[in-house]
Amino acid sequence: MSLPDRSTAVRRSFLSVFWVSVLLIATPSISFAQSDPLHIWVGKPDRPAAEKWVSDHLAKEQQYVDELLAAKVPRTIENTLRPFDNAQNELGVAGSEAYLMFAVAPQKDVRDAGQALAQQIQQANTVLYLNQDVYRALAAVDLSAADPATRHYMERTLLEYRLAGVDKDAATRAQVKKFQDHITEAALKFGRNLQENPNHVVVKDKAELAGLPADFIAAHPPAAEGSITLTTDETDYTPIMTYATSDDLRKRMYLAYTTRAYPANKEILLDVLKTRYEMAKILGYASFADLATADQMIGSAANMKAFLNEVDVASRPASRREYDMLLAFARQKQPGITAIPAYGRFYWEDQYARTTFNFDSQSVRPYFTYDRVQQGILDTAAKLFHVSFKPAPDAPVWDPSVSAWNVFDGDQLVGRVYLDMHPRDGKDKWFSSSPVVPGIKGRQLPEGVLICNFAGGKPGDPGLMQYDDVVTFFHEFGHLMHNILGGQQAWSGITGFSTETDFVEAPSQMLEEFFRDPGILRAFAKHYQTNQVLPIDLIDRMNQASAFGRAGWVQGQLFYSTYSLDLHDRPPDTIDLDAILRTDYARFYPYPFVDGNRFYAGFGHLMGYTSNYYTYVLDKVIAVDFFSQFDKNNLLGGEAAMRYRKAVLEPGGSKAGTELVRSFLGRPQNLDAFKLWMDEEFRGTAQ
């Protein structure tokens, strides 16, 4: 089983578990206050301070709601939509920063507070979206003279209200609130179980780590009795599954990884699925999947199924061909093998690349030290998006390891980004990007944060990264740039990447393609010991190796998408998590299922993306189509870069996703470029 996509960014929606579009009340200046009291982590970072900070924001939110309701008719944009947007600001920033503390705060009491406060804020958000008086006031606003962005904002807001059940009777609205509050609490517990209770694998001696890189072994010294403890964090899991020669070790790690938070999260998941289904039914939908897609580009669960089937047809033959090639290779090396187990996939793909493409994935790691990769990301983004980055050493941060960077467009300060990039005890284990402050044109600068778990960050550790980690870094950084460049709207509710959720991954997935270009890579990839620039022939072989397995990757994404859908398109009393897992796994993976796999207990996307994991597949199609518009001989300097910034990123959420696609491509997306991308490994054109 491949890993689900690392990104977890979500937009504001009542369907989202957490309202994390990060909306903040306007400040009198658009410069950064170095001791900004509006950030929850500034000052004394303890539970009482966090609780007071959130309480203050909730009080301001209520003041804006009262202002809206007290306004005299006629209802106007300024006396109704403006205070509504300000109320959302207060809820948004409170929810975003409370959840941020839940995910990254070094102090356990602050993480505990973040969890409780995130639930409290989501409850307030539910109350706002079930308030009929607010809905009627918004619906009465005269939009005849409104600009297109304001009209789009209002239309989408009213749709979200209807999807929340505002037009239902009092009893139904009360039940919806009860359901929403329950889901929020359960989802937070699901995430907390993953965050604070990772599984471990213990090896008896260093010999069991045969095949692992020397720096990995050095970073895992044995205990007094000689045993070595490995975690299921990405920094341990991925190297073990890729390089360990021991089948037994890989199998134990695989099962440890796919049983994280089991059985506790199994019961939580079943409870959430039941509650979502019941909520969808009282809102008039056949299933939660139908409710969850009603405000998306895809439009309906039926459209989602049709799209996934179309991609399945396009990718299945190549995926099976890849597996046959891999199995034939494995049989040459290990006569008698009848199938490649799930825990052998990454190992055999790496071995295949070494022989077929003369590419050892360990050979590029010395060229990708964390510090140089970070600088390379900043330099590449600066050239591509026509911005610059300057350190902000005086910016308050929640941990000394976090760095802050100011973003400039020419001489104009346009935003700030925070990088929290290395593992810590109690910190979220995944890779994600989130807004921290939404931009409001002329009033407020946008801020965003990267939460990752890459190697490095410790004295003496150069932080050697795998190529896939480098690509992930640029992917997540793309979300930050979307938040900054799209954060110049008049309304906080449509700023940054507050588009439909099933568009939000497309810009970042497109950026992944840039890091196959030799010129871009060689600008920063240098050997940490010799300072040698990454050789072009090594890049060519790396690109050939990375092109192999694309169709299988797509099939893996279809598995995650289909499993997410299958858990949300039927009555909960018919759901058997393990039976559906086995069925969907067998449909999309040729690798035999490993008994004991309970991956759903660690599949956090089921909480945030609910039924809509298909987002990653749809957005990959869009991303590859976008990339096809760039001049491959001048990726950073061609005309497409600025045109892309203007057409796709700068509008933020002020336009529908379909309009953003058409604006850049001149047409709707199609599968043509995607099919060529999948077929590249068989055309011998990887470069």
Predicted regions and their residues:
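Short pre-active-site segment immediately N-terminal to the catalytic Zn-binding motif
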Residues: 455-474
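Short, hydrophobic/amphipathic alpha-helical patches that form generic packing surfaces
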Residues: 89-100, 155, 159, 255, ...
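N-terminal helix-rich structural modules
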Residues: 34-213, 229, 630, 687
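C-terminal, non-catalytic "cap/extension" segments appended to globular domains
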Residues: 34-48, 52, 56, 227, ...
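Short His/Asp/Glu-rich catalytic/ion-coordination signatures at enzyme active sites or charged loops
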Residues: 37-49, 97-117, 139-178, 231-266, ...
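N-terminal secretory signal peptides that target proteins for export/translocation
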Residues: 1-13
